[in-house]
Design a protein with these regions (language model features):
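Catalytic-pocket segment enriched in acidic/His residues
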Residues: 175-226, 230-232, 240-245
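Short, glycine- and charge-enriched coil/turn segments that flank and shape catalytic ligand pockets
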Residues: 31-34, 110-113, 206
């Protein structure tokens, strides 16, 4: 059960199922290091996020929302199985040249306080809101080198759906994806991010860091993917690319200040 917070979204108490955690690690390529994968709180929060987005008071249709960007802040090491308090809220409504964007902000807390924060920037096409379109922040690109490559099999959308609970039809099969204009099923954006962070491994610290990604071209399944990254450092960049160097996702990591 979740508790309704009219001014702040929804919140709930959650615990980690070890068998489910192991399934997620296997699907996304994370090794068992005794910590939760940095993307796993998204999975803990997904039922609550769906409850918020399907609430009758939510102003935008769920169908057709596009996940543009995702940011996570790992404030402390993600140890233990809970209980945790997870909360979700919709924030930062802004105009966009194709409609409007908003952020699904997710927070995970333990008994010591705030542990993890996620921000998923979502586009709703055709919606008009007042204000000026914010400028896009661009980083000076760093030299990247290949660090790993893997196959994204035709069934990875279904396998990830079973681990994450996200059964969006564009990820499940070619027939269901074609109903939404895709020639084949496409990989979940958060699977692309999770698989990439698993491959980055020790380039990322255990805590006190941020990872931001921008989703680019969809990964049509099956696919062969290559991860490129800058040298190991406190701050760095990475890119997930497919056949003919097609860009699927661009990201960077940085140390949190303070």
């Amino acid at each position: 059960m979740y508790k309704r917070q009219p001014e702040r979204g929804l919140r709930s108490q959650v615990t980690v199922d070890p068998k489910h955690l192991e399934r997620y690690r296997q699907v996304c390529g994370f090794r068992d290091d005794g910590l939760l994968p940095p993307t796993y709180p998204h999975i803990l929060a997904f039922p609550l996020q769906m409850a918020l987005l399907t609430d009758k008071r939510f102003p935008f249709p769920l169908l057709g929302l596009v996940h543009l960007e995702n940011r996570i802040d790992v404030l402390r090491a993600l140890g233990g199985l809970g209980p945790f308090t997870v909360s979700v809220a919709v924030e930062n409504l802004q105009p966009h040249d194709k409609g409007a964007t908003f952020s699904i902000v997710t927070r995970l807390e333990d008994q010591l306080g705030l542990l993890w924060v996620g921000d998923s920037k979502v586009l709703c096409r055709g919606v008009k809101v007042p204000g000026e379109i914010p400028p896009k922040a661009e980083q000076e690109p760093l030299p990247l080198e290949p660090v790993d490559n893997w196959k994204a099999p035709a069934d990875i959308g279904r396998r990830y759906a079973r681990a994450a609970g996200d059964y969006n039809p564009i990820h499940l099969s070619a027939p269901s994806a074609k109903l939404f204009g895709f020639p084949r099923a496409i990989a979940h954006g958060l699977w692309n991010k999770a698989r990439s962070l698993a491959a980055l491994g020790e380039r990322l610290p255990a805590s006190g860091y941020r990872v931001e990604v921008r989703f680019q071209k969809p990964v049509l399944l099956p696919a062969s993917l290559t991860l490129l990254a800058s040298a190991a450092a406190a701050d760095g960049q990475f890119s997930l690319r497919g056949k003919d160097d097609l860009p699927h996702m661009a990201g960077h990591w940085s140390r949190l200040q303070g």
